[in-house]
């Protein structure tokens, strides 16, 4: 506030004091009250009734039909000199109008203060309506915030004209002086409302009604519409004030030493271009005030919906640091120090969904050449290069043309080819992050609702560039997938089918710049033209096994989308892909005389027959009816040759396992499980492949050898979650075998044939509950443990140990070595012998009476499932879903709860009952130490491949899987926590050692297992 006094000529000794405020001191946000919209036309021309029926499109624009149609007002603040938007738009909320007019009476507050605007700043009012779910401008109004006549801030009520789109003054008509277009009566009435005239109640009651009547007669009708608004009124006039800055001069270095106490630097603010910026105190002549032309750019960054807070200093630093022309030559020779290398390694192991900080992005950018030059895929010791490319792509600014050109014209073409791309990185590039419609969203749009012709050309060019670069990345990922063999591709097929959703969002969606979309390379209007869809269909047509699972995966997703139309995303993508696959498969088989298409039709027929059989059983019997009757009915039905299940019309591959040819079933070995859903156990008749050297004589024709394949068919449960877990277990098994570590896992086959049905392989087994409750013969119980045995009697009589002794005589032949199906690096020579990690010494269990082969299977499988179920957070573990096969392999079943979810209270992080340890010989036996060593090797091996596993879960976030949809935002975080990536390898091993000790000594899980067994007993 300031006070000026000046002498008058008539009274020389008298002074008049004028009190006013300065705009630079007014630290208050600009606020506007939107009152109402006045229509000066008595008869508004509306569309006649006949036109409504002739042209239904008129209904899209409600202002042509209703006099008081729904409208909303959007307010922006502009800098008058350059007409730059300097605030976030604000708009009125929805208001239902009546027949009296369009009245809002809503107070709006903008996110810019009065002391941040210049004297030429003005408000733009965009009156909009909704047409085809998008805002469309009805009219615009302008009001300058300062009056140039008096350099004062406008306040009080104002009546401003509304310019329609066909008005010649529509583009811009801003009055900086006295507002014209108002009658003398209107001016006086506004002055009265603004408080310039005293209010007398007795006089107002007499005069105001007559003024209103006169006002209606003499109202200005130069415009069809007028908008009435109110600005805040202040106690004093607000006069515009700014600071004139002097050109800085260069001072000697010796004179620029700081003479300011540290505390003083925090106590002063100076104003640069009417915006407060904390700086050092200005009384020191050695510190100069410099205008930053980029400051207004940072002020507008908050309009980015993906941004939270912005620091102008950080943004300026990033811009200067990434100046391509200045530091490219220097960056090529940069090498990180040991401390920086450790920091970069920590950044590289971050999951794909983790947000990188500005410092981390700058660090990745700084050493981009170092990582790109050392990205040789055949160097196993170079761990830091792993996952660098996706992290680098996440660290660049996609809105910066320099960074984009540098990345896609120099870094990727010269340093990154398909051979050097990790398979996990390729999967990450196919995720939802690399989408041009999110990466290419402009930082802000300058009044994009005004008209189509006023869109910025730079936004269009930038989006086209981002679109083409994203398409290039996705093609690069597909090219990497082409290097994988069909068996390896099958490990990721479930996630690749999910990735088709993200392809659809890119290739099906119309680009925002439709009129020039022809500039976009390879722009496809259909998902069928996406590189990933083309690749998967092509490989599925050529390889029958891959095509088998591709068909069922796509079929299930298609049915799920049709049954859940509320799910976001295009609903026809899987239907189109499925039809295209069948069409190409049929043509390919006809041209090459292959039976793949005929086999697929037989598989569909087989699933339909099983479905009708289950429905027939449910219709014929009640839920609580005896299971024996259902079994008898099932066997009679299967034995009836008229039902075509005893002997199929033609052999065909089993959908659950295409390597198995089935030709019929064994009715006497089929059954119905005791359950309300009545799942079937069908023992199929298989045709075994003939081995070389066992060919029969051709004199009597070909003779086939038959085998058995038991499976379960279930309707009523969604098996996709179990299918995902088994797929991850199978992948982990291959990763371990790739390191020469075969843990004898049992990833049994499971296939969802619809969202509510599926097939499950039936593996011979017994539950631990039944094994521990059995009584074994004395010959088995004391067959082991001679005089030299140190095993306690309680351990020697363990049910699991007795079970292994019982089956030791049956399993004397050692299984062949199982190799990984994962392809080695393409750059590695085939003659080079891979370096394998040192393995624990073989288990010797002669003192326990168990075959070394069975005990080896048991110890390894226990270690494998112990680690895997911990990483996946498998819950609801009890002795009924912990299984043991006659070959000694321990395994888990029923994955209804994963990612840490569990129906029981206080679930353990790892399910490792003490009875399982006793089956090895107890806590003090050598087998227990071997078990722990296998656990440690398994855990460290999977930690090294955590990026691949996390990327697979990342692609499943939009899948309709219960435990993923329960909290999709924390799925990756939950899995990542189990890997303990922030720890060193030694710390991780110690962490897992503590987990094993806690699980073995836990008391609560033992109690819960007893209660569960008791509950199962009473249910039986």
UniProtKB/Swiss-Prot annotation:
Cysteines paired by S-S bonds: none
PROSITE patterns xref list: C2_PI3K (PS51547), PI3_4_KINASE_1 (PS00915), PI3_4_KINASE_2 (PS00916), PI3_4_KINASE_3 (PS50290), PIK_HELICAL (PS51545)
Domain PIK helical, chain residue ranges per copy: 331-577
Residue numbers spanned by region G-loop: 672-678
GO terms under biological process: ascospore-type prospore membrane formation; autophagosome assembly; autophagy; cellular response to osmotic stress; cellular response to potassium ion starvation; cellular response to starvation; endocytosis; filamentous growth
Span list, region Catalytic loop: 873-881
Region (Activation loop): 892-913
Protein name, per record: Phosphatidylinositol 3-kinase VPS34
């Amino acid at each position: 506030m300031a006070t000026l006094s000046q002498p008058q000529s008539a009274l020389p000794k008298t002074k008049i004091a004028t009190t006013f405020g300065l705009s630079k001191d007014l630290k208050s946000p600009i606020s506007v009250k939107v009152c109402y919209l006045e229509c000066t036309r008595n008869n508004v021309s509306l569309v006649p009734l006949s036109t409504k029926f002739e042209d239904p499109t008129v209904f899209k624009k409600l202002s042509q039909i209703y006099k008081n149609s729904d409208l909303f007002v959007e307010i922006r603040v502009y800098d008058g000199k350059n007409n730059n938007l300097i605030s976030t738009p604000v708009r009125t909320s929805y208001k239902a109008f009546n027949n009296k007019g369009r009245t809002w009476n809503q107070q709006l507050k903008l996110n810019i203060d009065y002391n941040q605007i210049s004297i030429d700043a003005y408000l733009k009012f965009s009156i909009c309506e909704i047409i085809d779910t998008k805002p469309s401008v009805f009219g615009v109004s302008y009001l300058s915030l300062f009056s140039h006549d008096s350099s004062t801030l406008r306040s009080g009520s104002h009546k401003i004209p509304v310019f329609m789109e066909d008005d010649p003054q529509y583009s811009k008509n801003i009055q900086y002086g006295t507002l014209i277009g108002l009658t003398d009566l209107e001016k006086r009435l506004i002055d009265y409302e603004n408080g310039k005239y005293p209010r007398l109640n007795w006089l107002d009651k007499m005069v105001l009604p007559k003024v209103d009547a006169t006002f209606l007669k003499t109202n200005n009708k130069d415009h069809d519409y007028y908008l009435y608004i109110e600005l805040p009124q202040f106690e004093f006039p607000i006069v515009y004030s700014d600071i004139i800055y002097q050109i800085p001069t260069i001072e000697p270095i010796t004179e620029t030493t700081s003479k300011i106490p540290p505390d003083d630097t925090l106590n002063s603010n100076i104003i640069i271009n009417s915006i407060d910026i904390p700086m050092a105190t200005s009384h020191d002549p050695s510190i100069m005030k410099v205008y930053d032309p980029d400051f207004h750019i940072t002020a507008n960054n908050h309009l980015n919906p993906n941004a939270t807070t912005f620091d102008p200093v950080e943004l300026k630093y990033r811009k200067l640091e990434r100046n391509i022309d200045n530091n490219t030559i220097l960056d090529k020779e940069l090498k990180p120090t040991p401390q920086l290398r450790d920091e970069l390694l920590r950044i590289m192991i971050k999951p794909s969904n983790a947000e990188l900080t500005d410092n981390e992005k700058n660090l990745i950018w700084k050493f981009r050449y170092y990582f790109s030059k050392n990205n040789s895929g055949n160097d196993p010791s170079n761990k830091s290069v792993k996952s660098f490319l996706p992290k680098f792509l996440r660290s660049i600014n996609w809105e910066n043309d320099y960074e984009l050109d540098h990345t896609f014209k120099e870094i990727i073409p010269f340093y990154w080819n398909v051979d050097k791309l990790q398979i996990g990185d390729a999967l990450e590039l196919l995720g939802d992050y690399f989408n041009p419609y999110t990466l290419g969203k402009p930082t802000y749009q300058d009044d994009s609702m005004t008209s189509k012709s006023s869109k910025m050309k730079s936004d269009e060019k930038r989006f086209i560039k981002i679109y083409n670069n994203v398409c290039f990345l996705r093609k690069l990922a597909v090219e990497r997938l082409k290097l994988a063999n069909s068996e390896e591709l099958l490990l990721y097929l479930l996630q690749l089918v999910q990735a088709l959703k993200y392809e659809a969002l890119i290739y099906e969606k119309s680009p925002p710049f439709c009129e020039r979309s022809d500039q976009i390379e390879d722009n496809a209007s259909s998902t069928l033209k996406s590189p990933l869809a083309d690749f998967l269909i092509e490989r599925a047509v050529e390889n029958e096994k891959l095509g088998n699972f591709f068909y069922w995966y796509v079929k299930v997703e298609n049915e799920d989308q049709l049954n859940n139309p509320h799910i976001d995303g295009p609903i026809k993508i899987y239907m189109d892909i499925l039809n295209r696959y069948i069409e190409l498969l049929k043509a390919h088989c006809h041209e090459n005389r292959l039976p793949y298409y005929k086999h697929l039709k037989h598989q569909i027929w087989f699933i339909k027959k099983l479905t009708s059989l289950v429905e027939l059983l449910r219709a014929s019997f009640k839920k609580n009816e005896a299971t024996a009757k259902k079994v008898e009915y099932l066997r009679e039905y299967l034995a009836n040759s008229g039902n075509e299940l005893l002997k199929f019309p033609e052999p065909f591959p089993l959908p659950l396992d295409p390597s198995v040819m089935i030709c019929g079933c064994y009715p006497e070995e089929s059954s119905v499980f005791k359950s309300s859903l009545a799942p079937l156990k069908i023992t199929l008749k298989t045709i075994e492949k003939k081995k070389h050297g066992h060919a029969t004589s051709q004199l009597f024709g070909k003779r086939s050898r038959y085998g058995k394949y038991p499976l379960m068919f279930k309707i009523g449960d969604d098996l996709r979650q179990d299918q995902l877990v088994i797929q991850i277990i199978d992948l982990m098994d291959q990763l371990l075998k790739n390191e020469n570590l075969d843990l004898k896992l049992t990833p049994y086959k499971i296939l969802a044939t619809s969202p509510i049905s599926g097939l499950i392989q039936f593996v011979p087994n017994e539950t631990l509950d039944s094994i521990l409750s059995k009584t074994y013969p004395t010959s088995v119980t004391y067959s082991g443990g001679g005089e030299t045995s140190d095993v306690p009697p309680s351990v020697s009589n363990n049910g699991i140990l007795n079970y292994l002794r019982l089956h030791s005589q049956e399993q004397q032949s050692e299984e062949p070595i199982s190799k990984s199906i994962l392809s080695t690096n393409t750059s590695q020579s085939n003659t080079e012998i891979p370096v394998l990690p040192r393995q624990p010494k073989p288990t010797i269990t002669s003192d326990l009476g168990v075959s070394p082969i069975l005990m080896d299977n048991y110890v390894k499988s226990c270690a494998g499932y112990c680690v895997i179920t911990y990483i996946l957070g498998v819950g609801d573990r009890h002795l009924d879903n912990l299984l043991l096969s006659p070959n000694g392999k321990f395994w888990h079943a029923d994955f209804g709860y994963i990612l840490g979810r569990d129906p029981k209270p206080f679930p353990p992080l790892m399910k490792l009952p003490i009875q399982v340890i006793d089956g090895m010989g107890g806590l003090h036996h050598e087998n227990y130490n071997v078990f722990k060593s296998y656990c440690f090797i398994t855990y460290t091996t999977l930690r090294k491949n955590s990026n691949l596993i996390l990327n697979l879960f990342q692609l499943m976030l939009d899948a309709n899987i219960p435990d993923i949809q329960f909290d999709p935002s924390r799925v990756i975080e939950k899995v990542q926590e189990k890997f303990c990536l922030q720890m060193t390898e030694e710390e991780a091993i110690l962490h897992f050692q503590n987990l094993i000790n806690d699980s073995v000594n836990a008391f609560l899980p033992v109690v819960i297992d007893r209660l569960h067994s008791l509950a199962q007993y009473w249910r039986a």
